[in-house]
Amino acid sequence: MLGGGVGDSYQPIEKKYQLTRRALQLVHEFGFPVHVLTKSVLVIRDADILNAVNQHSRAIVSFSFSSVDDRTSAVVEPRVPSPSERLDAIRFFKSQGIACGMFLLPVIPGVTDSPELLEEAVAKASGAGVDFIIFSGMTLKEGRQKDYFIGAVRDHYPRLAADYRRIYGGSKWGEPVPEYSDSLNRTFGAIVRRYKVPIRMPPALYRDVLGENDLVVVILEQIDYLLRMQGQRSPFGRAAYSISQIPEPLSGLKGGLRDLWGVGETAERVVLEVLETGKSSYHQQLLAGQGIRPEARL
């Protein structure tokens, strides 16, 4: 992964120093796959290297959005390329044969979380040809960032102050109250099913570039997410975390999987199937419930 949730590899200074471009060149030279996450359309500059990576391994380019509305974005995402520019960049990379994702996060309560704006985002992403959408609401942990954000809310959306006190009332980690999160997830889930856009990266984009441990962890995490998006409880997240901490190949531990924290009978069955076949029928069943053909490279 080149990029992240709290920093962008394509800062304006990248135009001058080209550190990210040089990092991509190393990725190419060593034969690694790469997934770029950014808000910047400067990534188009590096299409030559990304195409080269995609020839020998896999290159994926994702853009993050809080909204696809240019006017709203100018307030909540100042000093970054507009959503329209980012959607055009997705179209460009898709025309090059490079898979693309939308990271629709954080969705901001009272600002970008209405059903209308969520549907606009999914519709425009689908129209641009995205291969998947990663979705999340917003956390608001106590500290400087929360103080800054609440100040911006007072300046631009003063009517929302009481809503934020209700939604972010008491969580140590800044998580919204469950009734808000559950409602938001149900709304988004209903919309994205209509457009048949995957809400996690499709297996065809990662199965052939991951080792066995990582493949198991990714599938378990996706199962966990898909179940929680349906409002169900899930043990698969704990199993995924436990397995992610194991340095040795998982295939050598087949007889002792149940000794791992969080791995019960159901998770063990999934793990053994993935080790045997490279896929999980339960995972595929959940993906099919989203209207997605798991084996298709979208």
Regions found by a protein language model. Name each.
Residues 1-164, 173:
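Conserved AdoMet/S-adenosylmethionine-binding subsite of the radical SAM
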Residues 8, 193, 241:
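Residue-level marker of positions within ordered structural domains that often coincide
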Residues 36, 93-96, 190, 195, ...:
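Hydrophobic, helix-prone linear segments
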Residues 36, 82, 173-177, 181, ...:
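General structural signal for secondary-structure boundaries
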Residues 56, 195, 260:
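Acidic-histidine catalytic/liganding microenvironments
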Residues 116-238:
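Auxiliary Fe-S-binding modules of radical SAM enzymes
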Residues 201-298:
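Long, highly charged, low-complexity intrinsically disordered interaction regions
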